[in-house]
Curated annotation (Swiss-Prot):
SMART domains hit by this protein: Glyco_10
Native species: Agaricus bisporus
Gene3D superfamilies hit by this protein: Glycosidases
EC nos: 3.2.1.8
UniProt catalytic activity: Endohydrolysis of (1->4)-beta-D-xylosidic linkages in xylans
Compartment(s): Secreted
Induction, per UniProt: Repressed on glucose.
Gene name linked to the record: xlnA
Role according to the record: Has xylanase activity. Seems to be involved in the release of sugars from the hemicellulolytic fraction in the compost.
Protein name: Endo-1,4-beta-xylanase
CC per GO annotation: extracellular region
Domain GH10: 18-330
């Protein structure tokens, strides 16, 4: 049966294939998307979200973060995360956990607790262990540590770093490994698409963790990008990460533009999506690409970047934009 399926995939013309189908044909594990609980009441959206020919991997955008899962110390709630996980599992889609430790979307008890070093490390250990254990056996990968760097490659002065230095990173990774030995453990960050100080900081961190025998399986490259400004070194930088012996994944891809939308901007966006996909395709250890939701209807961009938007491959009416064809071309050319 599997041989027949593979042969059919091999002979299908590109025009009949969809994004995940083409990613698998290119040797990748998946093409996927983030989603979030509020949009799961939108039936047309949910129908396309479950189209595994386009999306065979799902990331919960917010419902597995610290404020959603441990709102008060030692009290865990997983209901919204379970909704996303169960939906994906029922459809046979891979799951990416997001995220164990992040400086943002923390409950007040973490940010204002004024814990000492050992207490805060114990809190990190317990949170990561409990969260990852709850989803043991369900996740392909976890963003264990999210956005630990400043733009210059130094470590972000988060509540965790201020009290523990980099010790919280190793603590989180070890807790996650013990909680689920078979999930892939990632460090995830933005503005590490091209070479530069921040990417060098990531490389140095991963090397240091490896030298300390701290488990680290992958680097997540968020790829929140701008139309016409894709780093020319993106493929080389993905390869630099891969040369560390870890997986690489593009984890939160969107490519925003200054509004209003024009045909010229849409065509440039199509080319930019193609460029990003081709970079992943060219790097054997780049295992897949996830868009940060697939439709402009639910994009985070307009709420954060004033006057910008239209970042996703589908528009607000759930119609494919030229960017969709850019992804198709990136996998198939």
């Amino acid at each position: 049966m599997y041989l027949v399926a593979f042969m059919l995939l091999a002979i299908l013309p590109t025009g009949y294939c969809q994004l995940n189908t083409l990613a698998v044909r290119a040797g990748k594990k998946y093409f996927g998307t983030a989603t979030d609980n509020p949009e799961l009441g939108d039936a047309p959206y949910v129908a396309q979200l479950g189209n595994t020919a386009d999306f065979n991997q799902i990331t919960a955008g917010n419902s597995m973060k610290w404020d959603a899962t441990e709102p008060s110390r030692g009290t865990f709630t997983f209901s919204n995360g379970d909704t996303v996980a169960n939906m994906a599992r029922n459809r046979g889609q891979l799951l990416r956990g997001h995220t164990c430790v992040w400086h943002s979307q923390l409950p007040n008890w973490v940010t204002s607790g004024n814990f000492d070093n050992s207490t805060l490390l114990s809190i990190v250990q317990n949170h990561c262990s409990t969260l990852v254990s709850h989803y043991r056996g369900q996740m392909y990968s976890w963003d264990v540590v999210n956005e630990p760097f400043n733009e210059d490659g130094s470590f972000r002065q988060s509540v965790f770093f201020q009290k523990t230095g980099t010790a919280y990173i190793a603590t989180a990774l070890r807790a996650a490994r013990n909680a689920d030995p078979n999930t892939k453990l990632y460090i995830n960050d933005f503005n590490i698409e091209g070479t530069g100080a921040k990417s060098t900081g990531m490389i140095n961190l991963v090397r240091s963790l490896q030298q300390q025998n701290v488990p680290i399986d992958g680097i997540g490259v968020q790829a929140h990008l701008i139309v016409g400004q894709i780093p020319s070194s993106i493929q080389q930088n993905l390869q630099n990460f891969a040369n560390l012996g870890v997986e690489v994944a593009i984890t939160e891809l969107d490519i925003r533009m200054t509004l209003p939308v024009t045909q010229q901007k849409l065509e440039q966006q199509q080319e930019d999506y193609r460029t990003v996909i081709r970079a992943c395709k060219a790097v054997s250890r780049c295992v897949g690409v996830t868009v940060w939701d697939w439709t402009d209807r639910y994009s985070w961009v307009p709420g954060v970047f004033n006057g910008e938007g239209a970042a996703c491959p589908w528009d607000e009416n759930l119609a494919k934009k030229p960017a969709y064809q850019g992804i198709v071309d990136g996998w198939s050319q």
